[in-house]
């Protein structure tokens, strides 16, 4: 299976790897996993007073496609509001990275992670 140059780039040079303080009220955390393939993804967002995502971090244990999907997603969500971020579809990620059909589940994981992070943030804020 051949990976696209974008997958290889995000895998070899992942963007926004790290962790934000989960106790911070401005941080939403999404933790998702796919036991079938062993991929686990933690994605976090920091939201400003204006409701715009200021920062995003991830840590992914999994294959190159899972790492690339979460790396790309952290780039995409910065500067977006919560609704825009939660509206990102796995198909957009898969298309951007040219993921092969057997790796589509990695983009689904990334979509689930951003939705979970947005929900966690909103739950903290009581919104």
Feature-to-residue mapping (PLM):
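Short Gly/Pro-enriched turn/cap motifs at secondary-structure boundaries
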Residues: 31-36
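Short, thiol/selenol-centered motifs that function as redox-active sites or metal-ligating centers
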Residues: 37, 60-69, 106
């Amino acid at each position: 299976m051949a990976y696209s140059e974008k997958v290889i780039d995000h895998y070899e040079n992942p963007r926004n790897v790290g962790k934000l303080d989960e106790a911070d009220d401005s941080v939403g955390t999404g933790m998702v996993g796919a036991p079938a393939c062993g991929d686990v993804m933690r994605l976090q967002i920091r939201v400003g007073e204006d409701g715009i995502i200021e920062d995003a971090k991830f840590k992914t244990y999994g294959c190159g496609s899972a790492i690339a999907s979460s790396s790309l997603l952290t780039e995409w969500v910065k500067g977006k509001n919560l609704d825009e971020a939660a509206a990102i579809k796995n198909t957009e990620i898969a298309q951007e990275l040219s993921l092969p059909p057997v790796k589509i589940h990695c983009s689904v994981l990334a979509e689930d992670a951003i939705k979970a992070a947005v929900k966690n943030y909103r739950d903290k804020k009581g919104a």
